[in-house]
């Protein structure tokens, strides 16, 4: 099985590790990951065979706001074309040995695999419209359609919205190509709750399994007080959120007996301080999410899912003008402007008790079984 993991951030890698671990429990099939950067490092550290081939463009983020989104979109299109060449070389060399292509939001590999007759392709995709409760709520406004036999319907899947005005015409063309690829996939795995239709399969949140009790983790991590976890993902885009979180924490620390752990990620280097714990990059972030009393993060999907499944209260501030993060945050009632209310939000959240984890969340296992059935 070839597993193409988007290297933009670390969320794709973390959930793909969870899926791969479950696949190994079901079938004895070789898994080869293709990714890049910090995502490659994380996957390799978990013991999986991986190729470090992708080099994604970086966002330009200033004060928590995405700048020049159209420039980034153009860089992404160039990156996509490069990835298609890389994916084509990998797939053509290995298609006889790996007839299944799994892609976590890497459309380049999906595009290549759909031109290879012997290959089956599975897409993991989480851009679901935040205001829709069922798959049909937005049917009248979305143009994505899937066909299964003679049955046709409109999928409740979102589109990219980085640009506006006449520039959006280029983005609309990209979205049409993306919809075409989605429609042709053998399966589209959506890590959310919803009604399965045609090639869409809603599996629920996909998170890594926590194998220790929460109290044991807290003891091992040395957590004795209420603990805030601040994490910024796999890029330096969270610098502004970290700074604002530390400002709010230092004010609250004068009134509350509370600690703060900072996980800044692999690309953001910050000075140490005596009033918080700076861990830098950790490969077991999910365990820290479970052990903490509050998570403050950008609105990346994987951290949100981990917070939800593990029962840890969270504050999720999106990058301004990053449509996907803004959608994720909207579902939880947050927006970028809430960054100015962090002190009050933290105080409110710390009053909440840690909830029981959702032990029946089986997104990784369900996805692994879908993959194994196509092997």
Label each region the model flagged.
Residues 101-105, 284-327:
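A donor-sugar binding/catalytic signature common to diverse glycosyltransferases
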Residues 20-22, 212-294:
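Donor-nucleotide binding loops and adjacent catalytic segments primarily
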Residues 5-17, 236-240:
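A short, glycine/small-residue-rich beta-strand->loop->alpha-helix junction that serves as a flexible
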Residues 100, 116-135, 141-146:
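Active-site proximal beta-strand in glycosyltransferases
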Residues 66-108, 152-154, 158-162, 168-169:
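Conserved nucleotide-sugar donor-binding subdomain of glycosyltransferases
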Residues 7, 29-80:
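Conserved nucleotide-sugar phosphate-binding/catalytic loop shared by glycosyltransferases and other
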Residues 347-348, 359-375:
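C-terminal alpha-helical cap of glycosyltransferases
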Residues 147-236, 265-267:
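A nucleotide-sugar donor-handling region in carbohydrate enzymes
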């Amino acid at each position: 099985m070839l597993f193409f993991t988007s290297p933009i951030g670390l969320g794709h890698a973390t959930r793909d590790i969870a899926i791969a671990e479950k696949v190994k429990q079901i079938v004895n099939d070789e898994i080869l990951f293709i990714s890049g950067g910090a995502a490659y490092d994380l996957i390799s550290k978990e013991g999986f065979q991986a190729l470090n081939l992708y080099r994604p463009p970086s966002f330009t983020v200033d004060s928590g706001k995405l700048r020049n989104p159209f420039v980034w979109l153009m860089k992404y299109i160039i990156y996509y074309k490069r990835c298609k060449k890389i994916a084509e070389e990998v797939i053509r060399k290995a298609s006889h040995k790996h007839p299944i292509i799994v892609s976590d939001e890497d459309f380049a590999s999906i595009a290549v695999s759909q031109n290879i007759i012997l290959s089956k392709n599975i897409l993991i995709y989480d851009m679901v419209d935040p205001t829709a409760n069922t798959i049909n709520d937005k049917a009248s406004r979305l143009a994505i359609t899937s066909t299964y036999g003679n049955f046709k319907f409109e999928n409740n899947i979102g589109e990219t919205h980085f640009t506006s005005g006449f520039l959006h015409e280029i983005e609309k063309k990209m979205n049409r190509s993306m919809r075409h690829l989605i429609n042709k996939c053998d399966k589209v795995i959506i890590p959310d709750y919803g009604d399965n239709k045609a090639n869409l399969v809603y599996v629920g949140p996909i998170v890594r399994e926590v194998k220790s009790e929460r109290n044991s983790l807290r003891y091992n991590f040395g957590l004795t007080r209420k603990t805030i976890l601040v994490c910024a993902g796999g890029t330096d885009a969270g610098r502004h959120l970290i700074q604002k979180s530390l400002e709010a924490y230092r004010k609250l620390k004068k009134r509350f007996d509370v600690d703060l752990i900072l996980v800044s990620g692999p690309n953001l280097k910050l000075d140490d301080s005596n009033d918080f714990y700076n861990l830098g990059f950790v490969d077991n972030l999910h365990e820290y999410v479970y052990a903490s009393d509050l998570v403050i993060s950008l609105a990346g999907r994987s951290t949100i899912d981990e917070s939800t499944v593990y029962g840890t209260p969270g504050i999720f501030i999106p990058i301004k003008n990053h449509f996907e993060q803004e959608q994720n945050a909207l579902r939880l009632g947050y927006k970028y402007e809430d960054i100015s209310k962090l002190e009050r939000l933290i105080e409110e959240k710390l009053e909440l008790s840690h909830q029981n984890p959702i032990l029946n969340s089986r997104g990784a296992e369900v996805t692994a079984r879908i993959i194994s059935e196509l092997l």
